[in-house]
Regions:
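ATP-binding/phosphotransfer module of carbohydrate and carboxylate kinases, centering on a glycine-rich
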Residues: 1-10, 28, 50-56, 102-268
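Phosphate-binding/catalytic loop of phosphoryl-transfer enzymes
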Residues: 13-119, 265-267
């Protein structure tokens, strides 16, 4: 606040987007900002509000985990996925990385096609062979985040033309489209048009993932279209606060948010 030339009593609203502890956070923030109305939502809500600039739609999140979440014009909400790696996370970076490891196992066993993923998997896991991978995993030296990190190498090999890597991303795209389609059908049962915004690190894979995702989405939810998010989740929290204050979302407001978005991007 000091760096912005503000004091706590000048803040009239604060929006929060949290994974957990939503209700517990409110009194903490209110103690710091006594004049503010504090609005706390789940992080998927502020992610969607930012991505769609406050409009209805669906976000499709694919990072270490995966989930689809949507809000329609009536304010109704629905989600699909988000069950963690044991029960779900299909189409996530973890799922892609795990599939890459399994593909390498099959290739070396002679049960699957050869793939350029083999040296990539061993390099990423810092293991010379499958026996070492096995030992490292069961001794707790390979974390889920490490497996998810393999998705970057899968994307690179898919871009280079490796069939196995391309198929892994195509299967991930089908799973992600299935989640988004399920949400779209529940919130827009009459087949109205809906925008789906892809969010999360896996989408840095680019066209090898986005192309099959568009095709799969067209098959499962023909009225859905894929668009890039307009604002990041942190600005979704700002929009959450503005909406609670009934501030009109004018072009000037969006220009200010756009400038903030660019400043945030420059910090990364």
């Amino acid at each position: 606040l000091a760096s912005a030339g503000l004091t706590a009593d000048t803040i009239v609203a604060a929006g929060l987007g949290l994974t957990g502890g939503r209700h517990e956070a409110i009194p903490v923030v209110q103690s710091l900002l006594p004049a503010a109305e504090v609005i706390s939502e789940g992080d998927v809500v502020t992610c969607l509000i930012g991505a769609r600039a406050g409009r209805p739609g669906v976000i499709l999140i694919a990072g270490t985990g995966s989930v689809a979440f949507g809000i329609n014009a009536a304010g109704q909400r629905a989600d699909a996925g988000g069950w963690g790696y044991f029960l779900g996370d299909q189409g996530s970076a973890y799922d892609v990385g795990h599939a890459a490891i399994q593909a390498v196992v099959k290739a070396l066993d002679g049960r699957g096609p050869q793939t350029t993923l083999s040296p990539e998997v061993f390099a990423h896991l810092e293991a010379p062979d499958l026996k070492t991978v096995y030992d490292h995993y069961h001794s707790g030296r390979i974390a889920r985040a490490t497996i998810a990190g393999l998705a970057v190498r899968v994307a690179a090999q898919a871009e280079q033309g490796d069939y196995v890597a391309q198929q892994i991303l195509a299967r991930a795209a089908e799973e992600l489209a299935s989640m988004a389609g399920a949400v779209a059908r529940r919130l827009w049962p009459d087949g109205e048009s809906v925008v789906v915004c892809p969010v999360g690190g896996l989408f840095r894979a680019g066209q090898p993932l986005l192309d099959p995702l568009r095709a799969a989405l067209s098959a499962t939810a023909p009225a859905a279209s894929l668009e890039q998010p307009r604002f990041p989740p942190v600005l979704g929290a700002v929009l959450l606060a503005l909406k609670r204050l009934a501030v009109p979302l004018t072009d000037a407001v969006f220009e200010t948010l756009g400038a903030a978005r660019d400043e945030i991007a420059a910090l990364k």
